[in-house]
Swiss-Prot record:
Full protein name: Enolase
Its biological purpose: Catalyzes the reversible conversion of 2-phosphoglycerate (2-PG) into phosphoenolpyruvate (PEP). It is essential for the degradation of carbohydrates via glycolysis.
Subcellular location: Cytoplasm; Secreted; Cell surface
Tagged with keyword Transferase: no
EC number(s) stated in the UniProt entry for this protein: 4.2.1.11
Length: 424
């Protein structure tokens, strides 16, 4: 293979979709090729996530600046990566992890490291003249993922009184990614009309979903079912429902209760919702450290719906392995910035798949126009993706990229939902 090495790395502070700073990174090779990446940021974060380095300077951006992370890219990572083969991703990532030297990447920042990791891989793809998904996944990269579309936002993604964070639809009856996007858009507009008729707000939350003032989680689910029907689809057959409870956000660690309820009561609430609505996936139904609750939830519902761990696993291969050994959940949410390198992200996906767990590639609530996760979902054949609602251009950019990939793949492309409980 042609020997091409890293010659330069640039970084700068940009803004994400919430108006807070994040990193843009550009890696250039001695062949003149380059790759670019923008790093996302979460609002609801797991306590064991890799550290997102912020300046803590209250005089700018409420302390959320990333100038130190930018400096770390230029002054620490560039010197140790200059001259390294652009094609040796494992070496590139291991050099950065070693340069940081901490378990959670707190010295240099996972945001600095991830930006360089992704931009390096994109530069390698550009050097070979390949699409990013094809460079990473080779000839096996051909599965278009089923989207999980967040149409009603609550929790930490909206200030509207809803306890759960995401109320999603999954167009399981679609035969192509393009059709899935169209179905989602139809339901989105149907829901907007319903909200207008009920004199409910149609402003949107961080991820592009509506954020009306509602009295209960059930009311949000009722609205989704009605929107699906009014758009001309059959709930549970054409389109199913999914939840992200983000239960850690309403868990009292001292009392070990969920808004005053025990983990047994919380599991019963979720089981009741599954009986009443066509739900086939629940994410973070229990708090990340409530292992007894996770065991019960998996035992009660793990044979009938997808039980997704996000805060529970934080895309960390060690935590995923531990969770698998405990029998917790049956699916893993994959967020590259939770772990900080492309190599570790790949390891997390491969580990989950090897043990029969499904994976869902996911955005963060603070996003940019970067479409990397669309390529990653196809590259690793995850079969599912979470990238928000059918509004806000930082969300739409990912759907548009997926449709472009589907067109590029042609007959090779396969739209396939990896959730084994779809439509049950």
């Amino acid at each position: 293979m042609l020997e091409v090495v890293i010659s330069d790395i640039q970084a700068r502070e940009i803004l994400d979709s919430r108006g807070y700073p994040t990193l843009y990174v550009k890696v250039t090779t001695d062949a003149g090729t380059f790759g670019e990446a923008c790093v996302p940021s979460g609002a609801s974060t797991g306590i064991k996530e890799a550290l997102e380095l912020r300046d803590q300077d209250s005089s700018r951006f409420q302390g959320k600046g990333v100038l130190q992370a930018v400096k770390n890219v230029k002054e620490v990572l560039l010197p140790v990566l200059q001259g390294i083969s652009i094609f040796d991703q494992i070496l590139i990532d291991s050099i950065m992890v070693e340069a940081d030297g901490t378990p959670n990447k707190e010295k240099l920042g996972a945001n600095a490291i991830l930006g360089v990791s992704l931009a390096s891989a994109k530069a390698a793809a550009a050097t070979l003249g390949r699409s990013f998904y094809r460079y990473l996944g080779g000839c096996f990269a051909h599965v278009l993922p089923c989207p999980m579309m967040n149409l009603i936002n609550g929790g930490m993604h909206a200030n509207n009184g809803l306890q759960f964070q995401e109320f999603m639809i999954r167009p399981i009856g679609a035969t192509s990614l393009k059709e899935a996007v169209r179905m989602g858009a139809d339901v989105f507009h149907s829901l907007k009309n319903i909200l207008n008729e009920k004199n409910l707000a149609t402003g949107v939350g961080d991820e592009g979903g509506f954020a009306p003032q509602l009295k209960s989680n059930s009311e949000a689910l009722d609205l989704l079912v009605l929107a699906i029907e009014k758009a001309g689809f059959q709930p549970g057959e054409d389109i199913s429902l999914a939840l992200d409870c983000a239960a850690s956000s309403f868990y009292d660690t001292k009392a070990e209760t969920y808004d005053g309820k025990s983990y047994e009561e919380q599991v019963n609430i979720l089981a009741d919702l599954c009986d009443r609505y066509p739900i086939d996936s629940i994410e973070d139904g229990l708090a990340e450290e409530d292992f007894d609750g996770w065991e019960l939830l998996t035992a009660e519902l793990g044979e009938s719906i997808q039980i997704v761990g996000d805060d529970l696993f934080v895309t960390n291969p060690e935590l995923i392995a531990d969770g698998i050994s405990r029998g917790l959940a049956n699916a893993v949410l994959i967020k590259p910035n939770q772990i900080g390198t492309l190599t570790e992200t790949s390891e997390a996906i491969q580990l989950a798949h090897s043990q029969g767990y499904t994976t869902i590639l996911s955005h963060r609530s603070g996003e940019t126009e970067d479409t990397t996760i669309a390529d990653l979902a196809v590259a690793f054949n995850t079969g599912q993706i979470k990238t928000g609602s059918l509004s806000r251009s930082e969300r739409i950019a990912k759907y548009n990229r997926l449709m472009a990939i589907e067109e590029e793949l042609g007959p090779e492309g396969l739209f396939k939902d990896s959730n084994p409980f779809s439509g049950e």
